[in-house]
């Protein structure tokens, strides 16, 4: 099997599984803000796209959702299984391919947290989400903030290059595409979604006691963008 480039395999998967548990960026900033946009999920069937090590899946389950969680990495799915056991349906799936495991109008909502910028076939993914979501369904999606990317990389704000970013462990890199706000909103609206809410996640107050420097930085410079998108109630 060819390993999808948008997944975190082997040591990279283990690295992110450990990092996501308590990271200022994940645990204290993106995750609470993104899941807040999902709202009341009790009794709802939710698709967790790019579920990683299962942190968002576990929270959705604890809130009473029925969850189908997918990821392209066997390594991360192993961590997700350790976290949620058999409480969720876990599937290995490359998000650059159609969601052929799901019938039309299967899910009440979907969560796609910090995954979108890794996907190449984004128009296809959005079309597939429109297909598998029920009428009036929702998609909660978070991604890197275009301003944060511009501040970090410099140059043109409109650069849409693919980036191979080196991590603190210099032997590990992740690949993603820089996307402008114009590109993001354009893709979502062109796919037929309507924008319900948009937030620039701030860190939880508890982070100040854990890492004051990161708390101050994340309170002043947005790292992520999160949206709640709706399908039509056809």
Predicted features and spans:
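A short glycine-rich, Lys/Arg-flanked "PGG" loop and its adjoining helix->strand segment in the class I
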Residues: 123-138
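Class I SAM-dependent methyltransferase SAM/SAH-binding core
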Residues: 47, 53-98
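C-terminal lobe and adjacent flexible extensions of AdoMet/dcAdoMet transferase-like proteins
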Residues: 191-234
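A short SAM/SAH-binding and catalytic strip from SAM-dependent methyltransferases
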Residues: 109-122
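Short alpha-helix
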Residues: 175-198
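A short acidic, Gly/Pro-enriched loop at the edge of an enzyme's catalytic core
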Residues: 99-110
């Amino acid at each position: 099997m060819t390993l999808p480039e948008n997944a975190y395999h082997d040591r990279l998967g283990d690295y992110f599984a450990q990092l996501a548990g308590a990271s200022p960026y994940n645990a204290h900033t993106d995750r609470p803000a993104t899941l807040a946009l999902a709202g009341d999920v009790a009794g709802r069937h939710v698709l967790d796209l790019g579920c990683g090590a299962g942190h968002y899946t576990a929270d959705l389950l604890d809130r009473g959702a029925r969850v189908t969680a997918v990821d392209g990495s066997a390594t991360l799915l192993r961590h997700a299984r350790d976290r949620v056991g058999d409480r969720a349906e876990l599937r290995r799936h490359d998000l650059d391919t159609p969601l052929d495991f799901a019938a039309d109008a299967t899910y009440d909502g979907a969560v796609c947290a910090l995954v979108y910028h890794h996907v190449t076939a984004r128009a296809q993914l959005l079309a597939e989400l429109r297909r598998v979501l029920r009428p009036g369904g929702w998609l909660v999606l978070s991604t890197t903030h275009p301003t944060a990317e511009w501040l970090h990389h410099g140059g043109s704000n409109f650069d849409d290059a693919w980036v191979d970013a080196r991590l603190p462990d210099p032997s590990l890199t992740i690949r993603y595409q820089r996307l402008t706000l114009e590109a993001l909103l354009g893709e979502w609206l062109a796919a037929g979604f309507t924008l319900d809410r948009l937030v620039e996640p701030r860190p939880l107050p508890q982070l100040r006691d854990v890492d004051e420097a990161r708390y101050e930085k994340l309170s002043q410079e947005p790292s992520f963008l999160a949206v709640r998108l709706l399908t039509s109630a056809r």
